Structures are given as structure tokens and as C-alpha cells.
């Protein structure tokens, strides 16, 4: 990963140096300072490194930048070619700057960030070309006559839908599935098939039809991490991260006491972001039965110590009494989290703010 970031940094520095050197007159309002450029680059890398990104991440950024080196994009003699190359590179850096899978205005938010970062340095005309290219990535297909900056960014960004390598397409599918894991599989499947069908109509790539069949028939392996999570804390998150390596997806099942309920809804803000969260107030076996309409479900139980092990063995034995088909896995938290518990945190809440070190706000 470090090699990729070094390559990406080289491309960024070359872009900024190019803008400072070649964008004379109207396009360059003020020279971009080196320290400011460094600050913006670090901010961009931080965004593309967000944990909920599996496809729209550093690797994706690297691949697009690498793609600008391909000869095919520069065979035509475009006037002021250096200017449009710099626009393409700047558009690449910002095209997925904001990526919130459940939102439909990521492109608009991304261009706003780009404009805020460069309005003091670049002309409205220069920024407008970059903005339009980023907003155009909402479309699957772009032609050269639509604008060369738009065309190159679109061609690089949608390269995967032209792939004839089924392994590559399956890797893409798994990454997108993880990015949209906030949704139930039935909802994800419907939206994904709609997108892939549209992509096939545009590209005539028959491999996409094979991918449609895969998505339609898939039954993802899911870990169901159940608990009261009142609140969800760093120890829970440690178990969750380990479980992510074992399953296609992990669903958080929040148990609600049907007699007491949850009068205080504050617990929700400590739950992880970009996850499918389900509340249940009946037997967990009923929840499993419902989820198994779409998923191959395995119960996840977290352990801190030997005392937890005895409790969990009894818990699993009870589940087996209720249904013989239950699958489960026990995951031991790392030693630095063995002392953390929700009851400890609730106790601290009464006297001090030190409890905040033990909870998370999504992935932050």
C-alpha cells in the first residue's frame, strides 16, 4: 500500500506543479503553496482510506491514475493538452472524495469539497470543467464529443463493466456488496440487478449477465452478532473486525427486552456505521429464521475470559435445545479489551466523562 500511496503522491505533486507552471493568466488566480498542497493531499488520502470503502478506495484511486499513463488517451492532438491532463488528474482525485453508499448526492458533495479547496487558486472556468467531469460519473457511458475530460474520467471509472474476466467481476461484486451492507440482501439484490442490467444494455458485455445470475442466486455467508450493546463499545468493535474476516457480511442484532424496551435511544449513536442493524424482541432463533430467507447465518458470540466461556456454552446449549440447525462461532477479543464491558461503561457514565474512551461513533 505504501508504494501505491507514493505513486499517488507523485501524481498529485506533478498535477499541482503542472497547474502552477502551465496555468498562467486567467486559469491560475494564485500559486498553490506547497504546504497547502500537502495538507489537501493528506485529507484526500484519509477520505479514500475510510474503512467502509472496499472498491472506492486507495486501490481504485491508484488504478485510475495509472490509467492516465495509457497511450490511447493521448493519441489525438488536443490543443492545450497539458491543461486537460491536469483537469483529468484533479477530477480523479476528487471524483469519489465523498462516498456515502446510502446517499445519492456524493458527486455533488465531492465537487463542493474540490471547489472549497481550490476557489482561491483556480479560475471558475478550470474548476467548472473538473466539476462537470465529476458530476458526469453518474452516467455509465460518455462519448469523446461530450468533452475530453468527461470522457477520460468516465472511461477510467467504468472500466470494470467492460471486463471479460469473471474473477475480476466477482471481486468487484464482493467489494460493492460490502460497501452496501447497510441494506438487506433482498433490497441490495434488486438494486444491483437493475444496475447490472442497465450496464449490459450500454456495453453489450455478456459477462455482466453471468454476474446478474450470480447476484440473483447468491446466498451470502453472514455472521449475526447479537447482544444488548448498551452501549456498543471498543471490545465489541474488536470482535466485529475479527468477524469481518470470516464472513461475507456481519449483521448487528440488538436485543430489546420486550418488557422493558429501550426508553433511551442514545445507544443507537454508538452502533457502527454502514452496517445492517436489526432489532429483535423475540427469541434469537426467530430472527435467524427470518434472516435465512436471504442469508446463510452463523451466530457470533464474543468472549473476554473463561467466565464468559461458561456463560456462552450455556447460551449455545439453549439455542440447540430450540433448534438443532443453529451454527455459531465464538471469537475471543484481544487482551487489551478484556476489562471493557457495557455495565462498566454505564457505571462510569454516572460520575465521569472518561467512559467516552470506550465507545465509538460509527467508525470514527
Where are these regions (language model features)?
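Histidine- and acidic-residue-rich, metal-dependent catalytic cores
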Residues: 110-143
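Active-site flanking loop/helix segments enriched in acidic
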Residues: 38-67, 97-100
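Carbohydrate transferase catalytic cores enriched for Leloir-type hexosyltransferases
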Residues: 104-113, 185
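Divalent metal-dependent phosphate-bond-processing catalytic cores, especially two-metal-ion Mg2+/Mn2+ enzymes
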Residues: 2-18, 52-56, 67-82, 94, ...
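Nucleotidyltransferase catalytic core that binds NTPs
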Residues: 213-364
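Amphipathic alpha-helical dimerization/protein-protein interaction segment
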Residues: 1-32, 36, 40-47
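Histidine-centered active-site/metal-ligand motif
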Residues: 56, 60, 95, 106, ...
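His-Asp-centered metal-binding catalytic motifs of divalent-metal-dependent phosphohydrolases/nucleases
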Residues: 64, 84-101, 110, 130-138
Amino acid at each position: 500500500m505504501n508504494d501505491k500511496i507514493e505513486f499517488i503522491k507523485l501524481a498529485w505533486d506533478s498535477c499541482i506543479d503542472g497547474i502552477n507552471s502551465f496555468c498562467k493568466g486567467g486559469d491560475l488566480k494564485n500559486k498553490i503553496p506547497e504546504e497547502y498542497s500537502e495538507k489537501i493531499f493528506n485529507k484526500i488520502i484519509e477520505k479514500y482510506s475510510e474503512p467502509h470503502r472496499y472498491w472506492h478506495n486507495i486501490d481504485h484511486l491508484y488504478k485510475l491514475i495509472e490509467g492516465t499513463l495509457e497511450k490511447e488517451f493521448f493519441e489525438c492532438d488536443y490543443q492545450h493538452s497539458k491543461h486537460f491532463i491536469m483537469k483529468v488528474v484533479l477530477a480523479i482525485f476528487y471524483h469519489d472524495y465523498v462516498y456515502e453508499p446510502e446517499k445519492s448526492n456524493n458527486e455533488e458533495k465531492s465537487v463542493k469539497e474540490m471547489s472549497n479547496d481550490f476557489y482561491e487558486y483556480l479560475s471558475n472556468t478550470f474548476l467548472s470543467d473538473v466539476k462537470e467531469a465529476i458530476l458526469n460519473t453518474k452516467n455509465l457511458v460518455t462519448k469523446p464529443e461530450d468533452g475530453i475530460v468527461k470522457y477520460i474520467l468516465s472511461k477510467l471509472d467504468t472500466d470494470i463493466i467492460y471486463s471479460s474476466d469473471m474473477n475480476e467481476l466477482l471481486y468487484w461484486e464482493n467489494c460493492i456488496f460490502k460497501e452496501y451492507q447497510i441494506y438487506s440482501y433482498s433490497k441490495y439484490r434488486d438494486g444491483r440487478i437493475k444496475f447490472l442490467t442497465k450496464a449490459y444494455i450500454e456495453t453489450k458485455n455478456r459477462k455482466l449477465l453471468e454476474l446478474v445470475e450470480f447476484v440473483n442466486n447468491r446466498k451470502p455467508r453472514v455472521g449475526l452478532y447479537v447482544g444488548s450493546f448498551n452501549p456498543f463499545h471498543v471490545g465489541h468493535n474488536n470482535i466485529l473486525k475479527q468477524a469481518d474476516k470470516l464472513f461475507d457480511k456481519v449483521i448487528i442484532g440488538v436485543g430489546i427486552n420486550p418488557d422493558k424496551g429501550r426508553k433511551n435511544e442514545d445507544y443507537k449513536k454508538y452502533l457502527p456505521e454502514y452496517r445492517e442493524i436489526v432489532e429483535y424482541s423475540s427469541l434469537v432463533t426467530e430472527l435467524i429464521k427470518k434472516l435465512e430467507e436471504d442469508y446463510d447465518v452463523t451466530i457470533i458470540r464474543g468472549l473476554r475470559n473463561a467466565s464468559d466461556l461458561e456463560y456462552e456454552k450455556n447460551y449455545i446449549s439453549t439455542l440447540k435445545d430450540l433448534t438443532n440447525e443453529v451454527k455459531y462461532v465464538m471469537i475471543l477479543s484481544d487482551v487489551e479489551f478484556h476489562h471493557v464491558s457495557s455495565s462498566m461503561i454505564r457505571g462510569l457514565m454516572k460520575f465521569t466523562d472518561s467512559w467516552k474512551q470506550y465507545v465509538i461513533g460509527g467508525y470514527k
